[in-house]
Design a protein with these regions (language model features):
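Short, conserved loop/helix-junction motifs that constitute active-site signature segments
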Residues: 155-161
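N-terminal export signals
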Residues: 1-27
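Conserved small/polar residues in nucleotide/adenosyl-binding loops
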Residues: 178-180
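Hydrophobic/aromatic beta-strand patches that form the interior of the parallel beta-sheet core
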Residues: 42, 163-168
Length: 180
């Protein structure tokens, strides 16, 4: 299935990172309704070494704790949904991802992709995957026990995201599958 997203690339001031921002969403800087008080960050691990997770968790200026506790002036509180750093697991961890996907989260969100996007289409059946998060399918009536592919999460979260950020070399330049 072919997907098409029309997003604008906004380079980071340092020129190293880029973010794809939907210009139609008030998003990160605020909205006509007032200042932004909270933003959810859905950190999705593609095919990677997790180096950016390690670097972010060890940052000191600002620290990840200051960011998550809302102690940085003029920035909204960040609710981080990270596969390693989040306190929840299983259904509890996946619940906010599903709320964002369904449009019921109640706050703006950003998707951060660490690692390259897997080429799941290389498999001959619908059950193949390289990288997955959660299980049970995306349809509430589904009774499957198959893993939910990272590529499917990315497509499902895209329509409502205020921004998509590819973080690190693997996400920005990495190859997910090498055909020999």
């Amino acid at each position: 299935m072919a997907h098409e997203m029309k997003l604008q690339t906004v380079p980071h001031a340092g020129g190293v990172f880029g973010a794809d921002v939907d210009p139609g969403i008030g998003g990160i800087g605020g909205s006509p309704d007032g200042p932004l008080n909270i933003v959810h960050v859905f950190w999705i691990a593609g095919m990677s070494c997790d180096g950016c997770s390690i670097a972010a968790s060890g940052a000191t200026n600002p620290s990840v704790e200051d960011l998550l506790l809302g102690r940085i002036p003029n920035l909204p509180k960040v609710v981080l949904h990270h596969p390693v750093l989040s306190p929840g697991a299983g259904t509890e961890f996946i619940r906010p991802f599903r709320a964002a996907m369904d449009g019921t989260l109640g706050a703006p969100y950003v998707v951060v992709l660490e690692g390259s996007v897997p080429d799941d289409q290389a498999f001959p059946t619908e059950f193949g995957y390289f990288s997955a998060m959660g299980a049970g399918g995306f349809d509430p009536e589904s009774e499957t026990d198959q893993p939910n592919r990272v590529t499917d999460w990315l497509w499902k979260l895209a329509p409502g995201a205020a921004a998509y950020i590819a973080i690190g070399t693997c996400a920005t330049w990495g190859l997910s599958l090498i055909h020999i």
